[in-house]
Amino acid sequence: MRQSHQLPLMGLLLFSLIPRQQCEICEVSKENYTALNPLISTMINSKYNKGIQAANVLLSLRLGGFLSQSQDQQLTEKVLLATRSTEPSLTSGQLALAILAVGACKGPDGISKTSSELVRDLENKFQTEIKNMEEHDGNPLTNYYQLSLDVLALCLFRGKYSIRKVAEIFKPGNKNYYFHEQFSVDTGAMAVLALTCVKEKITRRQNQTDRKAIKNIVNHTKSLVNEILFQKTENGLLGNIYSTGEAMQALFVSPTYYNENQWDCQKTRDRVLAEISQGAFRMPTAAAQILPALMGKTYLDVNKDSSCVYGSDSFNISTQEPVSVTPAVSPSEIEVYYSVVINNQIDNTTVSVPNGSVFLDVMEQAEKENATRFSTLLAIYISRQGLKKKFHSRGELMGPLHHLCSGHKGQHQ
């Protein structure tokens, strides 16, 4: 009998579903690394680079290989200490981000710092998110940006999750992809990264139902990529300047879902570099989210089995303050209105803060004016006016607000 040269069905499925690598990822050349100085300085020197908030910074700088060994060790220990001491109160996305950061690579001792205990804790938090969706009209405890981080971390660190459930909840068109009826580009981008990881981790042991789920995941990914590209602006940005970094990552890992003429990567990169020179990334979270893409990296490059790459003399971290550009017309103070929803009870307030403030400043001012109403927040709904320029994306909200659980509609039980 002649031997068959046909691939097994599952092998063929694997071959057809895993996208080819893009021929060119438009990272910044080594000759232009100095253009990244403002980002590095912002991340390392910021007053918000503390505790769990440092996870975003650690992840970004590790992917870029910019930290010295001592800086890496110091920042890793800071994130680990904050994670372990506050884990019960962390949102699922915060814990996922910490796991990605401390497990992004292994240190000189050859050990990855991410523990199986943290991964199990994330599994439980993710299941709590799913349960809340089932009980509250599809609303997670946090939002889809954080749910995507959950799936990504569980996927990369061999946590437990249901492929079928992932395929079910991440359908395109789901209301959780939208913020004030506007598609959230960074939420969609994070979902693409998570779905791509799930798709690439399939094995021969998957059953027929899981194969169907994988096919759905492929279709979901393609739809989300198309939605991201639909948000492309004339100047090359994907959504806006703050969502562009993670959107670039999403497009890096999904080149088979769009044509080359649909996206000019170099145009996007050059626009981002121009924005950096104008001081667009003054917050460490924003800087951390844009840096990996400029280095040609994505969160899928996280690998707990790979040795960390440390900075060399070819890149000098500047201690100079990042450039800050003030608009021609800029009032010294702005008025911000927001409302807090706790168990369907709504508290509203209006506070005045200096122009350029972050949302954490708004909350601190509200607490000063009425500590009884605003000192403890389990859930928030943000109605943005004066700070609209500052918070363009879900990812940014996770930056200075790491100690809060921000949900799509502020519904937390």
Name each region found by the language model.
Residues 9-16, 124-125, 129-139, 152-155, ...:
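Ubiquitin-like/PB1-type beta-grasp interaction modules and other compact soluble beta-rich domains
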Residues 2, 12-37:
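N-terminal signal peptide
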Residues 223, 227, 249-253, 268-271, ...:
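Eukaryotic modular interaction domains in large regulatory/scaffold proteins
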Residues 39-43, 79-83, 122, 166-174, ...:
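Buried hydrophobic core positions in alpha-solenoid tandem helical repeats
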Residues 2-19, 45-69, 87-112, 134-166, ...:
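An alpha-helical repeat/solenoid feature that recognizes helix-turn-helix modules
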Residues 114-124, 209-220, 264-271, 306-319:
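Alpha-helical scaffold repeats of the Armadillo/HEAT/TPR superfamily
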Residues 28-62, 334-342, 351-355:
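Extracytoplasmic low-complexity, Pro/Thr/Ser/Ala/Gly-rich segments
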Residues 28-35, 68-77, 112-125, 161-165, ...:
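Helix-turn-helix repeat elements of alpha-solenoid scaffolds
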